[in-house]
Amino acid sequence: MRELFPKGRIVMNKKIAVIKGDGIGPEIVTEAMKVLDSVAKKFGHTFEYDRLLMGGCSIDANGVPLTDETIARAKAADAVLMGSIGGNTATSPWYKLPADKRPEAGLLKLRKSLNLFANLRPAVLYIELKNACPLKAEIADRGFDMMIMRELTGGLYFGARKTETVDGVVTATDTLTYNENEIRRIAIRAFDIAMKRRKKVTSVDKANVLDSSRLWRKIVEEVAKDYPEVSYEHMLVDNCAMQLVKDPAQFDVVLTENMFGDILSDEASMITGSIGMLASASLNDTKFGLYEPSGGSAPDIAGQNKANPIATILSAAMLLRYSFDMDNEADAVEAAVDKALKDGYRTGDIMSDGMKHVTCTGMGDVIAANI
């Protein structure tokens, strides 16, 4: 009798906290779960879903964007898969609340509660979608596949700040601080991830000006000694911003601090042509992570079956790879997305002449069937 699951395959039981969120969130997460179920069936795993509320839907149900119970249940899971949080800031009653009671405050609190410090944002240009890329054809034709790794908890955004009057002049001060431990842990994570990719790290800083960047560079060099298989380079942030549009194919893993990563990851996302294709992950110093699409809640198309679920499906692939060490399974999801695009299936945001238009559920069906 043929074995259903080949010898040597490790079968796992994993609990995934699922936060569908607001707007298009429930639709796109449902399709990602559909694909995960196909993975479980093919590879013999069991995925248990714990469905939680956060954001506007939690405000409506519980009066707050995030409850202590949701935090506890998220911590008890092996990973978190999330949709999108928030609504129309001009019309939604959620945005008449104080800032710390609005939907996005729940996400900030959850990230802090889960000790998430490393943000991963892949930027991939699929050859099938190269016409959507704003770069020159000769650049887009090469494609690119990079991972921006941004430190989330230190730097300018979390340093001491004040606004005061000095000698009659209003003066604002923000402090950029990093310690060696913060740098070391994000560098280790970057080199670990490079080992799963093309084994190259580009560390981005401003070491010609900033003391914090000089420390950053020193610690990265120390960490690199433990990864002889990984090539690495230092690049100044202004040069990196230029190289992203000049020759994005050169990058594999881009490691950088909080503010630089905030800016560079947005730049990298825009040259792909569609934010509906871009996954995201935030990790702590264990295997735990929160996985979500890079785009917003798109309330204008919510409930209309128009959303592109690919970013969320690719976020689920990242979950498999980085939290569960299921590289083969993650490869299968990414290959299934690739095949759907090669076969001409498109949601409205990436539609072009001659392609096959599908709904949100339609795209999920196609990708799940490709597993």
Over which residues does each language-model region extend?
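Glycine-rich phosphate/nucleotide-binding loop
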Residues: 56, 244-345
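Buried hydrophobic positions in well-ordered alpha/beta secondary-structure cores of metabolic enzymes
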Residues: 22-25, 78, 149, 190, ...
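N-terminal glycine-rich phosphate/adenylate-binding segment common to multiple enzyme folds
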Residues: 60-173, 259
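Flexible, glycine/charged-enriched surface loops at secondary-structure junctions
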Residues: 44-50, 197-205, 227-235, 325-334, ...
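Glycine-rich phosphate/diphosphate-binding loop of Rossmann-like nucleotide-binding domains
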Residues: 17-34, 39-40, 166-238, 250
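Short, Lys/Arg-enriched N-terminal segments with co-localized hydrophobic residues
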Residues: 2-11
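N-terminal beta-loop-helix "entrance" segment that forms/cooperates
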Residues: 44-68, 242-244
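Extreme N-terminal starter segment of soluble prokaryotic enzymes
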Residues: 12-16
